[in-house]
UniProtKB/Swiss-Prot annotation:
Keywords: ATP-binding, Cell shape, Cell wall biogenesis/degradation, Cytoplasm, Ligase, Magnesium, Manganese, Metal-binding, Nucleotide-binding, Peptidoglycan synthesis
Note on how the cofactor is bound: Binds 2 magnesium or manganese ions per subunit.
Gene: ddl
InterPro entries xref list: ATP-grasp (IPR011761), ATP_grasp_subdomain_1 (IPR013815), D-Ala_lig_Van_CS (IPR000291), D_ala_D_ala (IPR005905), Dala_Dala_lig_C (IPR011095), Dala_Dala_lig_N (IPR011127), PreATP-grasp_dom_sf (IPR016185)
Cystine pairings recorded for this chain: none
Name recorded for this polypeptide: D-alanine--D-alanine ligase
Length: 302
């Protein structure tokens, strides 16, 4: 097949995307596909023309325009199948506050939070218990995440994000173990337990070779593993996602599971989580990529 691989872009995760593209290109060639790579940072105006001549597109862009539904909408308009979530599902998952509202509606536990699209007054109080995570409302890989323990730290962290033009999400920190679980189609993968070297699983820990200890399958009781997988599937379906997604959680000592967010374009680098979970199920990296391609074609035909 002729495949359009879209990688790079202009988000803070650009380099991760480009590194992953090399691995995915090799996997596609192994299955006999012909790959055309475009980087929207330089080739955005070529996407429509090239996509019309392809059998399928593979989106490997984090943030805009890959995870916010823009490329998905373009590809749908020209009739080119692509892997993963629809434009609506992509945008809902990327907008953390919107996703959390739907999770709560479906009875999925998620930490208490406050969404701030604009900078509040100096006298404003968050109404949350410290410590608090201060996050960019739109973004992934734990970029622009700060853990604060008091009011002064809170405003410094918020100021930095607002000055960068970001919307802010405040979230009560849950004390527990970090776990993550991928979903492919209607099947949850073996969860991973993450023991980070820092205070939390931030951008450095996620992509550095020795940044965190990631144990797969997670060494947890069978009923806990099943619960994590069920939650990941429910989150996937709540956002009406297709293809592959990855849900991130905090598991408290009392076994309460808190859903943090869902990623619609999980990392596909050498150290990424979903490829490791797929490997635990017996899927090689090329097999995983091929499965996502076949799902893209199937979903397009529905």
């Amino acid at each position: 097949m002729n495949i359009l691989l879209l990688a790079g872009g202009w988000s803070s995760e650009r380099e991760v995307s480009l590194q992953s593209a090399e691995l995915i290109t090799s996997a596609m060639i192994e299955y006999g596909h012909t790959v055309t790579c475009l980087d929207p940072l330089y080739d955005f105006d070529k996407i429509v023309e090239v996509a019309e001549k392809q059998d399928v597109a593979f989106i490997l862009l984090h943030g805009s325009p890959g995870e916010d539904g823009i490329l998905q909408a373009l590809l749908e308009r020209v009739g080119c199948p692509y892997q993963g979530a629809s434009p609506a599902g992509s945008l809902l998952a990327l907008h953390k506050a919107a996703a959390k509202a739907l999770f709560r509606r479906e009875g999925l536990l998620t930490p208490k939070s406050v969404f701030l699209p604009l900078k509040p007054e100096v006298t404003w109080e968050p109404g949350l218990n410290y410590p608090i995570f201060v996050k960019s409302n739109i973004g992934g890989s734990s970029v622009n995440v700060h853990l604060v323990t008091n009011y002064e730290e809170l405003f410094i962290a918020m100021e930095a994000l607002f000055n960068a033009g970001e919307e802010v999400l405040l979230e009560e920190a849950i004390i527990g173990q970090e776990v993550t679980c991928g979903v492919i189609d209607d099947q949850a993968l073996p969860p991973i337990l993450i023991r980070s070297q820092g205070k939390f699983f931030d951008y450095y820990n996620k992509y550095a070779k020795n940044g965190a200890e990631e144990i797969c399958p997670a060494p947890l009781e069978p009923h806990v593993l099943k619960h994590i997988q069920e939650y990941a599937l429910r989150a996937h379906n709540t956002l009406n996602l297709q293809g592959c997604s990855r849900a991130d959680f905090i598991l408290r000592d009392d076994e309460l599971l808190f859903l943090l967010e869902v990623n619609t374009i999980p990392g596909m680098s050498a150290t990424s989580l979903v490829p490791r979970e797929a490997a635990a199920m017996g899927l090689t990296f090329p097999e995983l990529v091929e499965k996502l391609i076949q799902l893209a074609i199937r979903d397009h035909r529905k």
